């Protein structure tokens, strides 16, 4: 892209290419035991923390789903600002520690990986 014509005319050109709609975010949850898990993950960017707090269900998916030990559950989302909003949590109610593991991958790069006992949280910032 050249700006020579814009400099001569004194007009700033419009951006020639649109920025990507967002970043591809992949959330992965695994456990060592078969169980019913409670999983929550951010599926859309809230416009603000106040909007999220007012109605988190508009932005965060909540699932009660079976998970088999060693078999990953994978969820994807497109987020404009994953460094602000990417989060996945998982928990289960077993007497035996299910040893949860979670991971967040943004645009093909692992950005967070955590292990937990009866629950785990991966996020790109403190909540």
PLM region spans:
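Sec-dependent N-terminal signal peptides
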Residues: 1-5
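Extracytosolic low-complexity repeat regions of secreted or lipid-anchored proteins
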Residues: 72-124
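Mature extracytoplasmic domains of secretory-pathway proteins
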Residues: 42-95
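Short loop/turn segments at connectors of secondary-structure elements within structured domains
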Residues: 12, 21, 35, 96-98
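C-terminal region of N-terminal signal peptides and the immediate post-cleavage residues
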Residues: 6-24
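Short, surface-exposed binding/anchoring microloops in extracellular/periplasmic proteins
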Residues: 19-53
